[in-house]
Amino acid sequence: MRFFSIAALASAAAASQCGLRKLENLVTFGDSYTDESRLGYFINNNGSAPPPGLRLGESNSTASGGYAWGRFVAKSTGANYNNYAVSGATCSNKIISRDFAAIRQPFPSVLDYEIPAYKADTAFEALYPSRRANNTVYALWIGTNDLGYGAFLTDSQAPGTTISTYVDCVWEVFDNIYETGGRHFVLLNLAPLEQSPLYAATRVGGFGDSQFWPNKTAYNTTEYQYKMLEYTTNVNTMFDYGAPFHLVVKKRWPGASFSIFDVHRLLRDVHAEPSKYLSSPANVTGVYRTCDPVTRACVDSSESKASFLWYDELHPSERADEIVAQHFVDVVHGNSTYGTTYAS
């Protein structure tokens, strides 16, 4: 009976949108898959964070090679957009911490920096002129740096922490958002990193040594591709079961709605049928920008960026982000086969 109840709640949530009247405000958290300019601010200001109340402007110079997915959502819906994502971020530096010389400190993480920055900004009406429970959606996309090279994939996590610790951190992020009055949550699950040129085995066209994994060829790349597949699918399964469990069974966020956006399946569908999504000649195994792992000199493809699934060996392209944004809006409105929404 428990499972039928949860399924019914999911169906009802999709139909009613759980009290979300209109997407007037979008607030995002994450890493380079979402960041527009926040890490750049740290770099350009000697490692200092943006002061509370400062709105960082939009940018089409992101890890996608253009606009990031959140900006596409804001442009298509007219939503007021506040983005706290930082390139290089993990969920918490207490689990995965990676130093970044350009800012003379570890990459700022979601729980340790992004959430406090968001909380500080809520006091500024210029940033949040109309933030209410029924008109604001909070989205999190985090995990690429938690699971990858220099993290769980290479056994670089803090002693005593596990992938379950990372998943628990994700739920804690939403605890903090809930405390500020947030009631509409979207969790974008792990992208198919195992298909990215960075983590794909060299025998199937994956990169060798890379700017993001300098000694990849010292590893059994087939073994590590399958290891990444295991990690992403296991985490996504934990998300699928964890969201309704915490929301409906444990009543962790009373009165909230929680959507799981299956980006993993969406991007695998693009990979399987690229001509449906990408410009010709569609390319889902190569990259638009190739950078030398030693000199960091980069060369761009002569083909259109819109024909590539991957901008570089780790980051989805601007076209991929545009696809993600289109489906994100559908997920929020309960109109996507890539989304499941639960309500408490």
Regions from the PLM with identified roles:
Residues 1-20, 344:
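Fungal secretory targeting signals
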Residues 72-79, 173-186, 223-224, 230-260:
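A structural motif corresponding to the C-terminal end of an alpha-helix
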Residues 42-57, 149-163, 202-226:
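A solvent-exposed, charged loop/short amphipathic helix patch at secondary-structure junctions
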Residues 17-93, 318, 337:
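Serine-esterase "nucleophile elbow" of acetyl-processing enzymes
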Residues 53-168:
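Conserved SGNH/GDSL esterase-like catalytic core that processes O-acyl groups on lipids
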Residues 25-29, 33-37, 80-85, 136-141, ...:
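Structural recognition of the beta-strand scaffold that forms the well-ordered cores
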Residues 192-226, 245, 252-315:
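Mobile gating loops/cap/lid regions near enzyme active sites that modulate substrate access
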Residues 19-22, 74-77, 128-134, 138, ...:
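Extracellular/periplasmic catalytic domains that process cell-envelope and extracellular macromolecules
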